[in-house]
Amino acid sequence: MQNFADALPVIRRMLDSDVQAAYDGDPAARSVDEVLLCYPGVLAVTYHRLAHQLYISHVPLLARMIAELAHSATGIDIHPGAQIGSRFFIDHGTGVVIGETTIIGERVRIYQAVTLGAKRFETDEAGNLQKEYARHPIVEDDVVIYAGATILGRVVIGKGSVIGGNVWLTRSVAPNSQIMQSGNNKSSAP
Protein backbone atom coordinates (compact mmCIF):
# COMPACT_ATOMS: atom_id res chain seq x y z
CA MET A 1 0.00 0.00 0.00
CA GLN A 2 3.00 2.31 0.35
CA ASN A 3 3.29 2.31 -3.47
CA PHE A 4 -0.31 3.51 -3.64
CA ALA A 5 0.27 6.34 -1.17
CA ASP A 6 3.49 7.37 -2.91
CA ALA A 7 1.67 7.53 -6.25
CA LEU A 8 -1.11 9.88 -5.09
CA PRO A 9 0.67 13.12 -6.13
CA VAL A 10 1.24 11.70 -9.62
CA ILE A 11 -2.38 10.54 -9.82
CA ARG A 12 -3.51 14.03 -8.80
CA ARG A 13 -1.46 15.62 -11.59
CA MET A 14 -2.86 13.14 -14.11
CA LEU A 15 -6.41 13.90 -12.96
CA ASP A 16 -5.77 17.64 -13.23
CA SER A 17 -4.64 17.09 -16.82
CA ASP A 18 -7.73 14.94 -17.56
CA VAL A 19 -10.09 17.63 -16.23
CA GLN A 20 -8.30 20.29 -18.26
CA ALA A 21 -8.50 18.10 -21.39
CA ALA A 22 -12.25 17.74 -20.88
CA TYR A 23 -12.69 21.48 -20.40
CA ASP A 24 -10.50 22.31 -23.41
CA GLY A 25 -12.08 19.61 -25.60
CA ASP A 26 -15.78 20.27 -25.01
CA PRO A 27 -17.28 23.52 -26.31
CA ALA A 28 -20.29 22.95 -24.02
CA ALA A 29 -18.10 23.06 -20.88
CA ARG A 30 -18.65 26.31 -19.01
CA SER A 31 -16.12 25.84 -16.20
CA VAL A 32 -13.54 23.45 -14.83
CA ASP A 33 -15.79 23.00 -11.78
CA GLU A 34 -18.65 21.88 -14.04
CA VAL A 35 -16.36 19.35 -15.72
CA LEU A 36 -15.06 18.03 -12.42
CA LEU A 37 -18.48 17.70 -10.81
CA CYS A 38 -20.78 16.81 -13.71
CA TYR A 39 -18.94 14.84 -16.38
CA PRO A 40 -19.32 11.04 -16.09
CA GLY A 41 -16.18 10.47 -18.18
CA VAL A 42 -14.12 12.44 -15.69
CA LEU A 43 -15.63 10.48 -12.80
CA ALA A 44 -14.87 7.17 -14.52
CA VAL A 45 -11.27 8.19 -15.23
CA THR A 46 -10.86 9.37 -11.62
CA TYR A 47 -11.94 5.96 -10.35
CA HIS A 48 -9.75 4.29 -12.97
CA ARG A 49 -6.58 6.14 -12.01
CA LEU A 50 -7.02 5.03 -8.39
CA ALA A 51 -8.01 1.47 -9.36
CA HIS A 52 -5.09 1.16 -11.78
CA GLN A 53 -2.60 2.11 -9.09
CA LEU A 54 -4.09 -0.53 -6.79
CA TYR A 55 -3.97 -3.04 -9.64
CA ILE A 56 -0.26 -2.49 -10.30
CA SER A 57 0.33 -2.49 -6.52
CA HIS A 58 -0.96 -6.10 -6.46
CA VAL A 59 -4.35 -5.35 -4.89
CA PRO A 60 -6.46 -6.57 -7.84
CA LEU A 61 -9.70 -7.37 -6.01
CA LEU A 62 -10.04 -3.88 -4.53
CA ALA A 63 -9.08 -2.44 -7.93
CA ARG A 64 -11.89 -4.42 -9.61
CA MET A 65 -14.38 -3.34 -6.95
CA ILE A 66 -13.54 0.32 -7.59
CA ALA A 67 -13.80 -0.22 -11.35
CA GLU A 68 -17.26 -1.76 -10.90
CA LEU A 69 -18.38 1.19 -8.76
CA ALA A 70 -17.37 3.49 -11.62
CA HIS A 71 -19.13 1.26 -14.15
CA SER A 72 -22.34 1.27 -12.10
CA ALA A 73 -22.23 5.04 -11.62
CA THR A 74 -21.31 6.03 -15.19
CA GLY A 75 -21.98 3.19 -17.63
CA ILE A 76 -18.26 3.32 -18.52
CA ASP A 77 -16.36 0.02 -18.10
CA ILE A 78 -12.59 0.43 -17.77
CA HIS A 79 -10.60 -2.57 -16.58
CA PRO A 80 -8.12 -1.47 -13.88
CA GLY A 81 -5.27 -3.08 -15.81
CA ALA A 82 -5.67 -0.67 -18.75
CA GLN A 83 -2.79 1.82 -19.05
CA ILE A 84 -3.99 5.35 -19.85
CA GLY A 85 -1.82 8.41 -20.49
CA SER A 86 -2.49 11.96 -19.33
CA ARG A 87 -5.04 14.42 -20.77
CA PHE A 88 -7.50 11.58 -21.44
CA PHE A 89 -11.10 12.59 -22.12
CA ILE A 90 -14.18 10.40 -22.48
CA ASP A 91 -17.02 12.58 -23.80
CA HIS A 92 -20.58 11.44 -22.97
CA GLY A 93 -19.21 7.99 -22.23
CA THR A 94 -22.17 5.66 -21.83
CA GLY A 95 -21.27 2.23 -23.16
CA VAL A 96 -17.49 2.74 -23.36
CA VAL A 97 -15.53 -0.48 -22.76
CA ILE A 98 -11.73 -0.48 -22.33
CA GLY A 99 -10.14 -3.91 -21.88
CA GLU A 100 -7.46 -5.06 -19.45
CA THR A 101 -4.40 -4.93 -21.70
CA THR A 102 -5.34 -1.74 -23.56
CA ILE A 103 -2.64 0.93 -23.73
CA ILE A 104 -3.77 4.50 -24.40
CA GLY A 105 -1.29 7.30 -25.05
CA GLU A 106 -1.38 11.00 -24.22
CA ARG A 107 -4.12 13.44 -25.29
CA VAL A 108 -6.59 10.79 -26.46
CA ARG A 109 -10.31 11.55 -26.71
CA ILE A 110 -13.06 8.96 -27.10
CA TYR A 111 -16.83 9.20 -27.32
CA GLN A 112 -19.78 7.10 -26.19
CA ALA A 113 -20.15 3.41 -27.02
CA VAL A 114 -16.50 2.92 -28.04
CA THR A 115 -15.10 -0.56 -27.44
CA LEU A 116 -11.38 -1.25 -27.12
CA GLY A 117 -11.64 -5.01 -26.77
CA ALA A 118 -10.18 -8.43 -27.50
CA LYS A 119 -10.74 -10.06 -30.88
CA ARG A 120 -10.55 -13.61 -29.59
CA PHE A 121 -9.40 -15.53 -26.55
CA GLU A 122 -6.47 -17.91 -26.88
CA THR A 123 -6.46 -21.34 -25.28
CA ASP A 124 -3.67 -23.75 -24.38
CA GLU A 125 -3.32 -27.32 -25.74
CA ALA A 126 -5.85 -28.57 -23.18
CA GLY A 127 -8.41 -25.96 -24.23
CA ASN A 128 -8.01 -23.83 -21.10
CA LEU A 129 -8.44 -20.10 -21.54
CA GLN A 130 -5.09 -18.27 -21.55
CA LYS A 131 -4.70 -15.29 -19.26
CA GLU A 132 -2.21 -12.45 -18.91
CA TYR A 133 -1.37 -11.91 -22.58
CA ALA A 134 -1.76 -8.72 -24.61
CA ARG A 135 -5.08 -8.93 -26.47
CA HIS A 136 -6.44 -5.36 -26.55
CA PRO A 137 -5.56 -2.33 -28.72
CA ILE A 138 -2.73 0.15 -28.36
CA VAL A 139 -3.94 3.71 -29.02
CA GLU A 140 -1.04 6.09 -29.58
CA ASP A 141 -0.93 9.82 -28.71
CA ASP A 142 -3.34 12.44 -30.09
CA VAL A 143 -5.99 10.00 -31.34
CA VAL A 144 -9.73 10.73 -31.49
CA ILE A 145 -12.19 7.80 -31.57
CA TYR A 146 -15.79 8.77 -32.33
CA ALA A 147 -19.05 7.24 -31.06
CA GLY A 148 -19.75 3.58 -31.60
CA ALA A 149 -16.31 2.64 -32.94
CA THR A 150 -15.17 -0.90 -32.13
CA ILE A 151 -11.46 -1.71 -32.17
CA LEU A 152 -10.59 -5.34 -31.46
CA GLY A 153 -7.36 -7.24 -30.91
CA ARG A 154 -3.76 -6.22 -30.30
CA VAL A 155 -3.75 -3.63 -33.08
CA VAL A 156 -2.06 -0.22 -33.06
CA ILE A 157 -3.94 2.98 -33.79
CA GLY A 158 -1.17 5.29 -34.97
CA LYS A 159 -0.44 8.70 -33.51
CA GLY A 160 -2.71 11.53 -34.66
CA SER A 161 -5.32 9.24 -36.22
CA VAL A 162 -9.07 9.81 -36.28
CA ILE A 163 -11.42 6.82 -36.10
CA GLY A 164 -14.92 7.74 -37.25
CA GLY A 165 -18.24 6.77 -35.73
CA ASN A 166 -19.42 3.15 -35.96
CA VAL A 167 -16.17 1.97 -37.56
CA TRP A 168 -15.24 -1.67 -36.89
CA LEU A 169 -11.45 -2.24 -36.87
CA THR A 170 -9.42 -5.41 -36.48
CA ARG A 171 -6.22 -4.16 -38.12
CA SER A 172 -3.55 -1.61 -37.26
CA VAL A 173 -3.80 1.95 -38.57
CA ALA A 174 -0.81 4.07 -39.66
CA PRO A 175 -0.12 7.39 -37.93
CA ASN A 176 -2.25 10.35 -39.06
CA SER A 177 -4.88 8.12 -40.68
CA GLN A 178 -8.56 8.92 -40.95
CA ILE A 179 -10.77 5.85 -40.89
CA MET A 180 -14.41 6.57 -41.69
CA GLN A 181 -17.46 4.44 -42.32
CA SER A 182 -18.75 4.79 -45.87
CA GLY A 183 -19.61 1.39 -47.22
CA ASN A 184 -16.00 0.34 -46.80
CA ASN A 185 -13.50 1.61 -44.28
CA LYS A 186 -11.06 3.95 -45.97
CA SER A 187 -7.64 4.90 -44.77
CA SER A 188 -6.06 8.18 -45.73
CA ALA A 189 -3.35 10.37 -44.40
CA PRO A 190 -4.28 14.07 -44.29
Where are these regions (language model features)?
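Structural signal for interior beta-strand "rungs" in well-ordered beta-sheet cores
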Residues: 70-187
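Terminal amphipathic alpha-helical/low-complexity segments used for targeting or macromolecular assembly
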Residues: 1-68
